Amino acid sequence: MYLFLSNLSLADISFTSTTLPKMIVDIQTNNRAISYSGCLTQMSFFMLFGCLDSLLLTAMAYDRFVAICHPLHYQVIMNPRLCGLLVFLSILISLLVSQLHNSVVLQLTYFKSVDISHFFCDPSLLLNLACSDTFTNNIVMYFVGAISGFLPISGIFFSYYKIVSSILRMPSPGGKYKAFSTCGS
């Protein structure tokens, strides 16, 4: 549990740090331009840490599911090796999704010397600046975004559905309270 929390806090800090320093500098200098390479770098890190955040939350939901629904088997199921593997897979998948978004954007033709007048750079902004046809790239990016958003959310909802249904089957109110307090922490 603490492994997930520490990695989640690191991902959240990094997620915020991808845009906040640039925004503060832009406010101080009254300059909202970002270079093409800076935009690609910011977009890559933003996608990496955003996807990592959702995947770690999914792993934490699975951890809570095992703790509530299978409390006697928790130590066997959620051993340190599996926890490390879940964190590693979260990092790997988020890195792949981030690089897939970057590779889709890099395939297009741009005026590479142009500065982009935003403090935040996202793939749709770069697709709008492209000189070539972006229909296929839009489809790929929205499909990958939908999959990388839908799977973690469905995993979280499924885990918490099983947790709530398991808690509601408990006969004693004290057991329900203890289970809900464990789940809420």
UniProtKB/Swiss-Prot annotation:
Membrane side Extracellular: residue ranges: 12-42, 106-138
Could you read off the lineage of the organism from its UniProt record? Answer: Eukaryota, Metazoa, Chordata, Craniata, Vertebrata
Q: Name one GO cellular component term.
A: plasma membrane
Alphabetical list of SUPFAM superfamilies matching this protein: Family A G protein-coupled receptor-like
Where does the entry say this protein is expressed, by tissue? Tongue specific.
According to its UniProt entry, the function of this protein is described as: Possible taste receptor.
How does the UniProt record describe the way this protein sits in the membrane? Multi-pass membrane protein
Alphabetical list of Pfam families matching this protein: 7tm_4 (PF13853)
What protein is this chain from? Putative gustatory receptor clone PTE01
Species of provenance: Rattus norvegicus
Question: Where do the TM regions start and end?
Answer: 1-11, 43-62, 85-105, 139-160, 183-185
- What UniProt keywords apply to this chain's record, in alphabetical order? Cell membrane, G-protein coupled receptor, Membrane, Receptor, Transducer, Transmembrane, Transmembrane helix
Localization in the cell: Cell membrane
Topological domain, Cytoplasmic: which ranges?
63-84, 161-182
Task: Choose any GO biological process term that the UniProt entry carries and state it.
Answer: signal transduction
Indicate the family of this protein. Answer: Belongs to the G-protein coupled receptor 1 family.
What's one GO MF term for it?
G protein-coupled receptor activity
Q: Which InterPro entries match?
A: GPCR_Rhodpsn, GPCR_Rhodpsn_7TM, Olfact_rcpt
